[in-house]
Amino acid sequence: MDKKNEQQEVREENDTSINQESETQVELEEEVVNEECETSSEKTDEKEVDDENVTDINSKLAEKKLQDELDELNDKYQRLQAEYANYRRRTQQEKETIGVFANEKIITELIPVIDSMERALDACEDKEDTMYKGISLVHKQLIDTLVKFGVEEIEAESKEFDPNLHLAVMQESVDGVEANQIVMVLQKGYKLGTKVVRPSMVKVSC
């Protein structure tokens, strides 16, 4: 009986050991499965992160490309604006130059007429004469018209001689007058803006 009991106990111990080994094997298998699941989940998470990074990079690249194109278009627009402004300025300058040259030709033709009127006025002794008054009126109107177009008489009387404005045709030593001073205007000079149309003809002290 004792021997049978011992055998029974041995069998029970063996069964218990087998059961424990089976449970341990199952637990190990479960751990492996769990680890594989966790690894798979981590890989999935990593893939999602990588996809998000790629999407973010592509978005930034597209944004930078768009900004570069916008900057290039803005630069072209500013250059076109500058070129157009330069074109308008050149066109305006050309118009003004053409206008000045056209006016200069007319003025050059009118100046001798003014000279003739002034000689006639100087020669007239009776300032109350109808002829004198008529010539004087026309002379004034002509001078006023030329002034509107930018014509002005060159100052010369008692001024220092300037070869850019005056033409010296005579020299004379005058007491009390420094050298190179204009002592007499023989013919009036005129300029259109800054351009001399006709220099003043003068006598200069020496």
Swiss-Prot record:
A GO MF term: protein homodimerization activity
The protein's role, per its UniProt record: Participates actively in the response to hyperosmotic and heat shock by preventing the aggregation of stress-denatured proteins, in association with DnaK and GrpE. It is the nucleotide exchange factor for DnaK and may function as a thermosensor. Unfolded proteins bind initially to DnaJ; upon interaction with the DnaJ-bound protein, DnaK hydrolyzes its bound ATP, resulting in the formation of a stable complex. GrpE releases ADP from DnaK; ATP binding to DnaK triggers the release of the substrate protein, thus completing the reaction cycle.
Keyword flag Cytoplasm: yes
Keywords: Chaperone, Cytoplasm, Stress response
Residue spans of biased composition, Basic and acidic residues class: 1-14
Oligomer and partners: Homodimer.
Top-level taxon in the UniProt lineage: Bacteria
Location within or outside the cell: Cytoplasm
HAMAP family: GrpE (MF_01151)
UniProt-listed SUPFAM superfamilies: Coiled-coil domain of nucleotide exchange factor GrpE, Head domain of nucleotide exchange factor GrpE
Protein name, as recorded: Protein GrpE
Region (Disordered): 1-56
Family per record: Belongs to the GrpE family.
Species name: Clostridioides difficile (strain 630) (Peptoclostridium difficile)
